[in-house]
Amino acid sequence: MLEKNYDAASIEQKIAKRWEARGAFKAGMGAKSGTEPFCVMLPPPNVTGSLHMGHALNTTIQDIVVRFERMRGKNVLWQPGMDHAGIATQTVVERQLAECQEPTRQEMGRERFVERIWEWRHETGGVIANQLRRLGVSCDWSRERFTMDEGLSHAVREVFVTLYKQGLIYKDKRLVNWDPKLLTAISDLEVEQREIKGHLWHFRYPLEGKVFDPGDPTTFITVATTRPETMLGDTGIAVNPEDDRYKNLIGQSALLPLVGRRLLIVADGYADPSEGSGAVKITPAHDFNDFEVGKRNNLRLINVFTQKAEIFLHKNEAFFDGLTLSDELKKLVENLDQADRFIARHQIVSLMEEGGYLAAVDDHPHTVPHGDRSGVPIEPFLTDQWYVCAEQLAKPAVEAVRQGRTQFVPDSWKKTYFNWMENIQPWCISRQLWWGHQIPAWYGPDGMVFVEKSEEEALAAAFSHYGEEVELTRDQDVLDTWFSSALWPFSTLGWPNKTTELDTFYPTSLSVTGFDIIFFWVARMMMMGLHFMGEVPFPTVYVHALVRDQKGAKMSKSKGNIIDPLELIDQYSADSLRFTLAVMAAQGRDVKLDPSRIAGYRNFATKLWNATRFAKINGVKHNPAFKPEKVKLALNRWILTELSKTVSAVTTGIENYKFNESADALYRFIWNTLCDWYLELLKPVFQSFNEEAKNEAQACTAWVLDEVYKLLHPFMPHMTEELWCLTETPNMQRKDMLALAQWPEITFLDEAAAADINWLIDVITEIRSVRFEMNIPAGKLAPLVIVEAGEITRERIQRYGALLKKLARIETIDFSDRVLAVSAQMVLGEAIFCLPLGQLIDLEAERARLVKNVSKIEQDIEKISVKLNNPKFVENAKPEIVEAERNKILELRVAQKKISIALERLV
């Protein structure tokens, strides 16, 4: 027997253990013989990570599809795993060492420190895997992979060496995002833009050959900068070729204040005549845009920072090249060398002001890139790094999408993909860390590089090159975490070995991802998959939206509006959270997550639980001989027709990745059709002495509930699995767990029965609505008079009159040729249904009540209208407040209309 209350917390834990004990999610479980494979790769979360709402949405969507395809009998593999998360993991362990007062990373040395990280990984790393289990994800956990596992590391080395020998990996000196606290290059995804209240300094740069006079604009050119500390590396000034103010200066030179370096004035479209003075100082070694301008105009690159973002002047040959070492320059070097960049900023501004070079200072709020791990401003930094020639690898990846071999859902994301791929830059793949895949490159005594899969192979290559044994030094850098992630669809299946899994499951079937990693992960999987496997890694990329708070704001720690999915699971259940996310996962629309919605879908789960209890109390049980096509009762034929439509809607919705439409169809059918109407209409049947009708109703209800559990299972797996178990009967043993049951396939259709029962529901609904609007006491039975009833209506009243009386609180049903005075009239089909109000309520009292209500509503509408017609309110109030007021006035107008209709009925 089912408990009175559904205890989600204990049941979800119990069901999770059952799935695991059964091995329900292992690759191929439940697959029909000879069926096609279906494979999804779980985007590997960081081993340091904790479940957030983005994970919850992403994995819920994947799990819906995976459970659906598993129930359809496909050979399913949902491959889970963890990312080693280079920077994040190294930072976590270093912080732990400091907290425990253990030796630092540097004191430990590389080998011991890496061992320490592995210890942390085995002891506490990977918490998120257990958190994902709480959500109910049906991955094959027995195949869990880790990007630092030996098998995946082998694949990484194979790819690196192959690309290097094909000329697609090389070393180069370019600008990178440099974190001066962590002392490593970082990816764009590890950079967050923060708004700061900064300044814009306008400087006068003297023109060569002119005597500088701050009061004479013909002796200088004005440039502006938010970063005075970088001016020491200036090598040019750019002006727009169409800017008449500077055409005569193009090709001439200015002098860098304080330093004396000649700066060529070049014509370049990067300079915007409408911005500031229209002239831009160019620092190619410290700004990404300037780097490109410098390349186009052959300007020198002068790095004036150390790796710690301190000023680097002493022994900086590039800085001194072409300069006369005056006493002033010596003093400048002495004062600024090794100064922190922000201290140097203030010193340089002071020196510029003293020399008359400071023209103006403006307050200038602007965004500054910060390292998301270190929290410090990152620097565009000129350094030697390893790169992948992404441009060449991107071409076939772009073509594959153009040809439709890989499609994006929604299709609009294709444009974003093309924009990124067609403007792709070399991919910096080296990181100055100890944790990660160490680059398989060794250097000889003369710096000659040997790239091989192992040290033994590198030594052999060196011997062949030098003709003798030499000592090699391995490259200290590790690979960007995204490098190993890019191989995920085939490295996890055993590549470069030829395995059965690789042959069966590559290419995979679907990639589900957030839009923020289309470039970082999806595009790179496309490039690597095509290059090494000769085929796209997946035919479909489903891009889900962002989960925002209930007001539509992006979640962030600074705003204090982060919603913890684990807290929601504790409070409402995993199933309720999953269903909420599915309902709100409309394509291309961000999810505004309101906890009250989750509470509502918890009630939805309770509704089905109670419906099952009601069914069992009323003797509902399985009949092995039950066949839908043999059903006789119109009520049962109607529910089977509605169920068939729901099966089609849910199936089509999941197939087309319209999860909200599937969830909506399920909600309407379960809450309204099944619980509110079918079970309600069955009560007289259950209570009757007609054993044949009762038996059919009991068997049909049991069969329909089973199909409902199956349909709802991908969305609410825990509760449906429990109900599947609890509704097993001795004469109907379950063949297996619900997770491995067959997906519903029903094409039952009885339009006549559907028309009859839907008519009955419409009549009851209309009468109930009028009773509520007219304030008719719930206990008072009402007479019903039907005017102009045709043959169909009379036949239906004859068949369903008893049900109508019971459910609509009707005392008598009569037919008439004329409409009664002072009656509520409802037109349904060809007939008019009348409730004579004079016999039911005090007309004058009811009229007074309604007039009072409508007057109050009109006053409220007037108040809100005044607000909304005030431009200052609309412009200055928060958008969500304005939207709330607009919604309120719409609700009031709906209520106003309903009361007006009720008043008309009293005339």
Swiss-Prot record:
Is this entry keyworded Nucleotidyltransferase? no
Q: Which residues form a coiled coil?
A: 838-870
Q: Which residues bind ATP?
A: K557
Q: Where is this motif: 'KMSKS' region?
A: 554-558
Subcellular localization, per the record? Cytoplasm
Pfam families documented for this protein: Anticodon_1, tRNA-synt_1, Val_tRNA-synt_C
Listed A to Z, the keywords are: Aminoacyl-tRNA synthetase, ATP-binding, Coiled coil, Cytoplasm, Ligase, Nucleotide-binding, Protein biosynthesis
Where can the motif 'HIGH' region be found? 45-55
Can you state the subunit structure given in the record?
Monomer.
Similarity comment: family membership: Belongs to the class-I aminoacyl-tRNA synthetase family. ValS type 1 subfamily.
Q: What does this protein do?
A: Catalyzes the attachment of valine to tRNA(Val). As ValRS can inadvertently accommodate and process structurally similar amino acids such as threonine, to avoid such errors, it has a 'posttransfer' editing activity that hydrolyzes mischarged Thr-tRNA(Val) in a tRNA-dependent manner.
Per the record, the domain comment is: ValRS has two distinct active sites: one for aminoacylation and one for editing. The misactivated threonine is translocated from the active site to the editing site. The C-terminal coiled-coil domain is crucial for aminoacylation activity.
Protein's name in the database: Valine--tRNA ligase
Protein's organism: Bartonella quintana (strain Toulouse) (Rochalimaea quintana)
